[in-house]
Amino acid sequence: MECVLPIKDKSDIEAMYETLREHNQRDYLLFRLAIHTGLRISTLIHLKGLDVLKQDEHCQAVNNVWRQPGISEINVPLPQSLCEELDEFMKDKGIGHDDYLFRSMKTKRPLSRQQAYRIIHDAAVQNGLSQVGLQSLRKTFAYHAYQSGTPLTVIQKYLGHQTLSETLKFIDVPQQNRTITIQLDL
């Protein structure tokens, strides 16, 4: 099995957006929602309209809250632009509360993992990216959360990892970047 990596360069992410958007809106939104939420692909492909709608029929953060008794929740809100794109997509495609968000055009059933893989892998190949697969989406989310300053322990809990080293390896942080300096001037 090939080792997949996060997509670290934001220009590569933008290129993936463009490639997928040109193919179709569903594939673009699958990718965008995946890298903005860190949801497992098995969860993503089974999302329904109700999972991304509030009662007032507007987009909300996907029901993607990590919970453990005694520990506060971790919320991952969606960017407003993504919410608007999801709203428009659902209206255009007639996706109701009980309909799958990312469904096969032929069967109206959820995309299979194999279909999702082909979508992401083909777009990556078109953009000259190697070592990109479905797990890359979750890794991309975690990597960019780490780069934006989200504490590693929060990312570890969100991903369900047992150790910090597992999380660092998952997001492909080089060993030389793993040193943390605490300097106090009391």
Residue ranges and their predicted role:
Residues 1-186:
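Conserved catalytic core of the tyrosine transesterase superfamily
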